[in-house]
Amino acid sequence: MTVIASVSASILPDHTGLASAVRHDADTTLPASIQPSVVVNLSAASTSASAQTYSAQGTLAGGGQLVWRNNVQDPISVMMAHQFRANTLSERFSGLGAALLDNFNKGSSNYSQSVQVQGASGPSTAPANMHGDVSLRIKTRSGALVTLSITSLANGMDIKVQSDSTLTDEERGAIANLADGFQSALDGLTQVPPKLNLTGLAGFDTRQLSSVDLQSSLNNGAVVPSSADVHLDKQNSAVKVSLPEGKMQLSVSTGNPAIQGSAGQRAAAVANLIEQLDNAARRGHGNPTLVSMFKDAFTTFNGKAGTLDSAVMNLPLNDREHAMLTGLADYSGSITDTPTHPNPLRPGEVDKFEWTASQSTTFKGSTADDHTITQTQKMHLTAAYHRPLKPGQPLQLSTDPDSQNYYYDVVNDDAQSRADVAMQNGLLTNATLTQSADQNLHEIKVVKNKITDDHTVPGHQARTLDLLNLLNQVPLDGTPDQSRNLGDTDPNLIKVHNLVLLTSVLSSNDAS
């Protein structure tokens, strides 16, 4: 349900006929996307000196003309009139996304409205470079395409919703059910700092809809705008985010539901990856906003993967095999902070953070009784940063040699894990885990512009574990898929699964 705030009728188009305050202005030139059918004159004499966008009477502070594309007073127009000159994008987009998709429950597929201020004598209190462009594309299983766009400029707003085909009642309902999810995504992207709230969109009805795409370009007054690109369908989920602080991307392929484990296995794998990222962010000084957005997306996309219908699996796996896999869909992701050069006397010392993680799974064979599986996990961290000689001291690096007192750390970490599984004549014949972890820290100490220490701390771990005997102790029930979902309860399966999960430092646990 969308709540519409009260707005004075004097700033809205009058659909019953406009008096002297409203005229069609042939001399007014607007962008092609905002061609007026109604112009509302707002006299400066009728406004107060308030710095607020609207006076108590509903007029614009500073006077001006409100130009509307369509002469209607619908709830969306009311929201636009109330919000389009707000001081933040979060306020401007508040409730609009949900209201637009809610309309599909009312039989409406197309909507178009715009409003723009012309001739205002007082500038908006919002930053002059504030703008926002958001588009949502929804494809139905029948092939219909629904497009929605919201554009917010310094002195105007433009909204369009269009369907290229007639929608069924079921399709309308599925689209309307995305209202809260779409609004949550907008609220997250427009807040400062931004967040990725994609759970509602990722849970779209796959019986009626085939894909959902969300794109945004937003600027809350920063020098560099932020952008996000989200794609969701039944087999793939992907997001790319670009901020002034850096970029992150994640893609998850759910096209092979056979490798998805039990709920407990998936939860453990998600928690482990998040823990590894947190460790990398602390070790490499990663940007917290990008780290948080990656974790939100990773949790959401793998939650979506867990809800897929596993009845379409061509190659069911038994409990022993699932223990050798993470339980997650294959993925690839990265975080790259924008490099900085904080030391003017040594510009070659770059502060940076680059983290990547991935999982890939390959199958050979086409039956449950005879096949091999190889699953590879990889994680890499490259980072560099300056820090003070004493914790808590501010770094005040300048061209003055006396300011050159700091540590410069360069991190280069790499971790890999490979699981090899083989079934032959219905029996598990291979369950091998090969893992390695390398951590390298190169540290330079500078005192009054002189390098007083320069050393490297290397670290290397490697192991190969044969887990076949441990897994063969787990009983199977003889059903076609030989699975009783013991992955969350059997101690041997839990132990094996914990060993499988990729870590930047190998634990002392083994198969004993």
Describe the residue ranges of each PLM region:
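Short, compositionally biased, intrinsically disordered N-terminal export/targeting signals
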Residues: 1-74, 78, 82, 141, ...
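Long, low-complexity, repeat-rich, intrinsically disordered, solvent-exposed domains used
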Residues: 134-137, 149, 160, 202-262, ...
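A eukaryote-biased signal for long
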Residues: 229-512
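Amphipathic, non-membrane alpha-helical segments that mediate helix-helix packing
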Residues: 69, 75, 82, 93, ...
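N-terminal, intrinsically disordered, small/polar-rich Type III/flagellar export signal
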Residues: 90-216, 222
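Alpha-helix boundary/N-cap detector
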Residues: 67, 84-91, 95, 166, ...
